[in-house]
């Protein structure tokens, strides 16, 4: 604990380095697809963030002005989103008031409680800035603008080799900004070393060899989180389940009918019965409270991730046709869902094979010849 307190104190009291250019490479499935460059000069940071995968990706230019404590007092963001929408975002904090403008419109609030702004279209560099602020906070949790609470949990410290020597980077779990945490690593000086997910990473230039290890660890942390959620929230019914007092849609009559009792066992609906039909031995009975029971939806074009698996279930999507993915990542995800380790929809793997070009997706399998393409077809067929 003392080590992290000293690190936080150092990061809070020391201004950013003078005239330092921090460069990162953007990697998708281990392939270099772009860059992030941060030109740090005293309390001013100029950022160039650009990557392209499958012909799409953000083009972002940021200018951040920081106060003496490292909190943003002005933030201007211009460019385009991955699908080409214009980005024109700004933030300013002055005289105890914060004002901002993003794609949802304009807003303002008192900046006495929350001082850190979370941008709508910022680069990953800003996550390192927020992580440093959270490390300097006593409980590593703080209110942020435009709203919400960000929190930070310390994970493992790992050493990575590169041209500037070994770096002992500590991984952190940053929560509160999205439905799933972000996983990022800071070096001993508190500077961003990497941001990682199971399929994507932003890594300090020269240390790209850390990509796979970082992504594997991000997948491990993500899996552990969803395993905990599964243990807390999942219900394991040993016998048939009867939901009473529910309405169902009759596709022949095009109307809602009922109330009925719907009985299922394992993964099949056994019967739709009168609401007062007798219960058989060993059933679990659930009161549907007059709701409407609808079939699970089928997502016909998905690129599912572990973070999205549970969200699909929560949204009523119980089956997904995955149109392209990292095969190793997807295979592990399917196995964890099928054995009940985590929650997720049934996944039909639709093998993705693409020729190499400037517009290639780095997801699935890239080939250059007819023979390579046929070999990949055989590879997928053997795993159907």
Could you describe each region identified by the protein language model?
Residues 57-124, 178-189, 193-205:
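Contiguous hydrophobic, core-forming segments of folded domains
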Residues 140, 286-294, 300, 308-384:
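Divalent-metal coordination cores built from histidine and acidic residues
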Residues 253-294:
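Histidine-rich, glycine-flanked metal-binding segment
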Residues 36-71, 145:
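N-terminal, post-signal-peptide region of Sec/Tat-exported proteins
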Residues 205-248, 278:
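Extracellular/periplasmic ectodomains of large secreted or surface enzymes and adhesion receptors
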Residues 31-33, 84-169, 196, 212-222:
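Solvent-exposed helix/loop surface patches that form functional interfaces
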Residues 19-25, 41-48, 68-76, 96-99, ...:
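Short, hydrophobic/aromatic-rich segments at coil-to-beta transitions
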């Amino acid at each position: 604990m003392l080590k992290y307190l000293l690190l936080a104190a150092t990061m809070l009291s020391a201004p950013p380095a003078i005239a330092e250019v921090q460069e990162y490479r953007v990697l998708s499935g281990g392939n270099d697809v772009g860059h992030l460059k941060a030109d740090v000069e005293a309390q001013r940071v100029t950022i160039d963030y650009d990557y392209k995968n499958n012909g799409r990706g953000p083009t972002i230019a940021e200018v951040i002005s920081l106060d003496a404590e490292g909190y943003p007092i002005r933030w201007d963001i211009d460019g385009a989103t991955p699908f080409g929408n214009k980005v024109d975002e700004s933030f300013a904090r002055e005289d105890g008031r914060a004002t901002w403008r993003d794609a949802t419109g304009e807003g303002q609030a008192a900046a006495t409680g929350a001082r850190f702004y979370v941008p709508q279209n910022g680069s990953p560099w800003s996550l390192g800035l927020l992580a440093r602020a959270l490390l300097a906070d006593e409980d590593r949790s703080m209110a942020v603008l435009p709203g919400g609470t960000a929190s930070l949990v310390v994970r493992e410290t790992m050493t990575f080799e590169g041209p500037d020597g070994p770096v002992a980077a500590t991984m952190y779990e940053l929560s509160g900004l999205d439905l799933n945490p972000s996983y990022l690593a800071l070096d001993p000086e508190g500077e961003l070393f990497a941001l990682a997910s199971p399929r994507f990473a932003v890594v300090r230039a020269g240390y790209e060899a850390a990509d796979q290890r970082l992504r594997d660890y991000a997948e491990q942390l993500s899996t552990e989180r969803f395993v905990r959620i599964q243990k807390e929230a999942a219900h394991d019914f040993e016998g048939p389940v009867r939901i009473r007092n529910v309405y169902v849609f009759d596709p022949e009559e095009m109307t809602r009918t009922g109330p009925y009792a719907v009985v299922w066992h394992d993964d099949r609906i056994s019967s739709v019965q009168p609401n007062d039909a007798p219960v058989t031995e060993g059933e679990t009975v659930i009161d549907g409270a007059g709701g409407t029971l609808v079939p699970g939806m089928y997502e016909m074009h998905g690129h599912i991730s572990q973070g999205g698996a549970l969200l699909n279930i929560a949204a009523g999507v119980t089956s997904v046709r995955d149109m392209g993915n990292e095969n190793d990542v997807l295979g592990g995800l399917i196995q964890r869902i099928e054995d009940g380790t985590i929650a997720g929809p049934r996944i039909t793997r639709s093998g993705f094979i693409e020729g190499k070009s400037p517009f290639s997706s780095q997801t699935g399998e890239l080939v250059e010849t007819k023979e390579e393409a046929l070999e990949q077809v055989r590879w997928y067929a053997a795993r159907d």
